[in-house]
């Protein structure tokens, strides 16, 4: 018979006899889930029994109290009493109560463990620890290793993680679990110190295995930025004669590791024997040479677009001249082709002052990566040459930095000498411009090198307190010390930002602090808080960029909340715009959510917020072709405010870079819109500037580069690309900084090189999809019927009406007398083509995997969307040393028949070394003063 009331049992609890009370508790425990509402009235009496140390069944009383609180929904109290029940609480019991308590216990433990991490004395209840560990053991016993590892990572229990991994009997299983932990550690673990400890532990486990996953080890090295670990890895690979994998990892490090790590690694390996080729690869010279060769050989530069822009935008106006200079630089980025500059010396001569500085620096983008001949190319414009203009001298030093960006070992000494020699005269106008270029140049060349020598040299320029050179010196320091978080440097920058009277320097220092805290996540919180609360607008502006860079790619909820709050509450428009822009950086890895988050902001009454929305979408979705982002941006291209239209057009070009008309139908419309804005005399200057720069971006690198923000093989952010974008967005204040976008350009190619000689063989691999989908968009052509339009406009309206009436009455299709047969034929062909294009269903352009394939030649254009359809047949002569998983860049190949002859592709450097001397660089005539 079921019990319908607990009253008799509750009455027994008031008896003096402990045996009777125990009986009552046992009975209540069996019915408490049904009668909890009645029993809860006497909860204080049951709690008193638990607190009575003389009562033998006090733990049972705790269990009953726990069940009452569970039914009341008071889970924290329920867990507390369940822990007090000790052995009476059976975690193996199959009930909703036990499942809930265990789940709540784990959550409580994780919360307490994360709060107490790093503290000497833990404040966690031992019973809570016991339940947590018993549940983990239960997972391990059941073979649920990933679940156990996930919980251990969330609770910062490194000991549990290492125990699970080291107790695996099978190395393949261990490697799978290590990969899981590595991905989780680099993407979800938010505590930097714990993340570092995990990665070091994983390195130690991996390096001791009989058959380690060396590529996983390289990922750990990049995340830790530790050259000593890298040296250990290469020593092991060389000692095992595993040179093919060593070369592949070296190429990977060149594109993903910091310059500081590479410099230290080269210095270490240079002392050993048999490391010459590794040292050469790690210098970055082969990679840059390969990319220059690809970009030069495959360039599809649409010069008619540039000429159209040049003729539509009067070079006498600095704004327009700068726009065409930047657009030209982007279109030719890395191709080493400066024919447009040579052919338009008279137009270049129109440049005045800082437009001349920008135009000279643009040569650095065109020759970017030319590490062997870069200085020789810029020589005619460098200080000490015949160039008379201070803007040419300063621009050439900036251009030198752009050529050697991230690989500046050979040029840093020269740039440092220029700074040291001139820093004492920083207040002189001529020297000020020169130091401005030199400071930006050395910052680029020494990016992330953490060089104290560069810092000390730039500090002298900064403290001279001259606006132009001081602001550039601040940025140079930030770039050099990128991501270091150096406390001494940070203190110097923050203190001087409050002392200087120059707004430009304050803003430069604020951005430098953001660069200093790149990737530091919660370690930057104190700096962010201090800057956000500052009364100076420039410091708050720097604060949101510090959030952007410190939390770049983390999708941190806290960071997003802070930015959204600033975006709607700050009193300064610049800060609000920057705050919305910063959302794009934080959400790089979660880019699909950005359109939804900023959609309402894109309709804000404040044009600066709308502008920030455009930049946020451009940053997060760069190179992705995301339709949702395009849908938000399209209305902004018709915004009534000119700078909003400017930002929208630039953002669209960043999103649609390397998209074809078949992979994204918007490409044609956007290109046409950009041309129309540039040609329209009634458009405001800022909108035309944006359209011209956007045209350069969408056609960048001879249509052979994209903006790639992640290193797919390493699972890390592409630091150069992220920093390039962050600095590019500063063009709002200073147009020369637009050149920084070139750091974000990644060549869209897969370059296979032979492992034994690093030469590029001519061979092909397979692409398993429909041929023609990824072809270059067609070149721009002037309308064929342009001349016909001129005739048509000359015809009187009365004549036209008479012809129309005559045509209607005859009801025939007679040819109009002012049009030839050839013209009619061309018009009909164009109309038929348009009708055919309109009839083509969208399904035809969907990219699908096919069992059939077409061949793609080595070192040719392979766009990001195409990579997943690329395959290297196993039975071919050349196969990758690492399993190909759809990544671009340099791939080391095994040659099955190395003794057989094969045709190889000569690189730009090899051509110059063997066939001809370096051509003499052209000089702009003195009478043009450029």
Swiss-Prot record:
Residues 806-840, 911-930 are annotated as: Disordered. One of its GO terms (biological process) is proteasome assembly. One of its GO terms (molecular function) is ubiquitin protein ligase binding. Keywords: Proteasome, Repeat. PC repeats lie at residues 358-391, 395-428, 437-471, 472-506, 508-541, 542-577, 578-610, 612-646, 647-684, 690-722. InterPro entries: 26S_Psome_Rpn2 (IPR016642), ARM-like (IPR011989), ARM-type_fold (IPR016024), Proteasome/cyclosome_rpt (IPR002015), PSMD1_RPN2_N (IPR048570), RPN2_C (IPR040623). Pfam families: HEAT_2, PC_rep, RPN2_C, RPN2_N. Residues 812-840 have a biased composition (Basic and acidic residues). One of its GO terms (cellular component) is proteasome storage granule. Belongs to the proteasome subunit S1 family. Acts as a regulatory subunit of the 26S proteasome which is involved in the ATP-dependent degradation of ubiquitinated proteins. This is 26S proteasome regulatory subunit RPN2. The lineage of its organism: Eukaryota, Fungi, Dikarya, Ascomycota, Saccharomycotina. The gene is RPN2.
